[in-house]
Amino acid sequence: MCDSFVNERGKWKMQAYLFVHFREKATPDGEQVYFGLSKDGFHWEEVNNGRPVLWAYYGDKGVRDFTITRRKDNGKFYIFATDLSLAYGMRNQYHNSWYEISVNGSKNFSVWESDNLVNWSEQRLV
């Protein structure tokens, strides 16, 4: 662990807030993984010059509704997201019906994992 990220008791200290999100636009890059960083939770900076940090290449090739969590036993970070893409034809395929999408659309979640919030695994579907 880098000393600047650890407090005097050897615990990780807070450096910034990480916002994991997608963009609500029906284009292939809109339904991907974006990061925002903030020191105070009010003023945010885009990561990766506003481009997606991670891409969904499997399943519906788009993701929404993220959650990020950290496992206590191994310290790894995980991003979970709904496997859903409106940009790749979900609206046409399911007649613009959220009911049809929810009943007949993908039943998967996309998952990425990281030891450090910088380097991420390949997407996998669960």
Which stretches of residues belong to each language-model region?
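Carbohydrate-active catalytic/glycan-binding domains of CAZyme proteins
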Residues: 1-126
